């Protein structure tokens, strides 16, 4: 277990939570943006975060870690590397060069689409899907649907942050996707 500068054992979840910056009224008034760049800038925080995910999934017999565009691309490949499994990108529409499968989902105002290469995984492959944050759950649900369409077994959805007041983690769990998040923040 990591230790604080005083030598006392460090609560890794509380430490990760403390490393996330809140930016009020960004990108629009009323939004409290949870900025993970401060967490990523700290080698200690990044190591603790990666270790939390690796400890959770080391015995899960995974084939891949899938990351959601864009901030899921930051942590998912590191976790995949540490677990000695492959990384699968799930991208915004029009960003992948090969044949793709796509899935649209609703946003608060409008919709969006994500894609995956049609050969990204095989039937029966065990995959976790990662993002930085779960808000409404739409992106992770779309990613799960794409992976399942390719025949993958989606073991769990994982994120650094949950915003439970927005209902995404509940929506995902109710749809049968187990969810793991390191920390949560009230509000949005």
UniProtKB/Swiss-Prot annotation:
Keywords: Cytoplasm, Glycosyltransferase, Purine salvage, Transferase
Organism: Burkholderia vietnamiensis (strain G4 / LMG 22486)
Quaternary structure annotation from Swiss-Prot or TrEMBL: Homodimer.
Gene3D superfamilies: 3.40.50.2020
CDD domains in alphabetical order: PRTases_typeI (cd06223)
Presence of the UniProt keyword Cytoplasm in the record: yes
Class of this enzyme: transferase
BP GO annotations: adenine salvage; AMP salvage; purine ribonucleoside salvage
Coiled coil residues, start to end: none
Pathway: Purine metabolism; AMP biosynthesis via salvage pathway; AMP from adenine: step 1/1
Catalytic activity: AMP + diphosphate = 5-phospho-alpha-D-ribose 1-diphosphate + adenine
Subcellular location: Cytoplasm
Descriptive protein name: Adenine phosphoribosyltransferase
NCBIfam families on file: apt, PRK02304.1-3, PRK02304.1-5
EC number(s) per entry: 2.4.2.7
GO terms assigned for molecular function: adenine phosphoribosyltransferase activity
